[in-house]
């Protein structure tokens, strides 16, 4: 998920058993002032209560939600991870700015960060993600999907109905990023 001053975002993904295929199941924007509690409560309830229905009729909950804690409302994100065990804070790392030339891992490391609850500091889990590695993986899979003669056989696919939140605006935003080599 992503955090902005005026909204929270969630992209629900479904994976096959060995993790080699992923499907974008549902996308939603939670509008509201993220300095206030209502939008966070709504987000947490969605993560807890959402169920995806499989083709064979099973219902699956969200087992893990990664929410960006690298900018907007970091303390709110960290506090939410304490309240909802399905939500984890994640922060992107861009290694070219840190003296390293190449990333090789999607998940770089797991660390901790302090959340301030009232006047008490509490340690929270924080997952660091290699942003270049993640974007390369996503855009390689998207490129294969776009040019595939049989999209359902690819490792990544999206529903064809905008009812799942994947409307034209979603795809324009997804494809607005461009790779720049540093």
Residues covered by each model-derived region:
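Structural motif
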Residues: 9-11
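Two-metal-ion RNase H-like nuclease active-site motif
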Residues: 1-5
